Structure formats: C-alpha cells, structure tokens
UniProtKB/Swiss-Prot annotation:
Residues reported to bind Ca(2+) 2: D90, D92, D94, K96, E101
Residues the record lists as N-acetylalanine modifications: A1
GO cellular component, one term: cytoplasm
Domain of life of the native organism: Eukaryota
Name of the molecule in the record: Parvalbumin beta 1
Sequence similarity: Belongs to the parvalbumin family.
Note: Is regarded as an important allergen.
Amino acid sequence: AFAGILADADITAALAACKAEGTFKHGEFFTKIGLKGKSAADIKKVFGIIDQDKSDFVEEDELKLFLQNFSAGARALTDAETATFLKAGDSDGDGKIGVDEFTAMIKG
C-alpha cells in the first residue's frame, strides 16, 4: 500500500520499535518510517490509506488500528496510546484528525 512512498525496511524497523504495549510514540514512529521528510503530497497519500472509511478524517477507531495499516499482523494501539495520538493530532478539538492536522503532526 505504501510502495513508492515508504521503504519496507523502515516500516519493519518502526513496527519492531513499538511492538510492546505502551511503547508507541507517534513522533518516533513517523521519523523511523521516513514520513517526516516526505512531501505534503506523499503525506496526503499515506493519510488516504489510514482513513479507512474515506471520510476525510481519521477517527479514534482508525487510530486504534493505525499500525495495522503498515502490517496486518501489527498490534492495535492501547486506549491510552490512541488517546495520546488523537490529542496530539486533533488541533481543533473536533475529536478527529484531518489531513492538514495529520501533516502538521508529522512535520512537527
């Protein structure tokens, strides 16, 4: 799904780094998978994959399963990890993350 945008080796390393519950940190993950240095267009493509229901927003249930976008066998995020991730990205407080919020969160 991420072919041409992200390297498989980077995805594997990033997933390995947050395999244990409670170890997912979105900033570190975005850096490890090589997303931080990508163009806005590439980030938008990644957002489109994560936005499973194509609502133009990533909601809490999609964030919980965030890692599974990168590998079907990856774990779900814990409720605490999901809440932290949502809070970090949801700058307007509407309970979901839009593409501009997602881009801002990655670019940090």
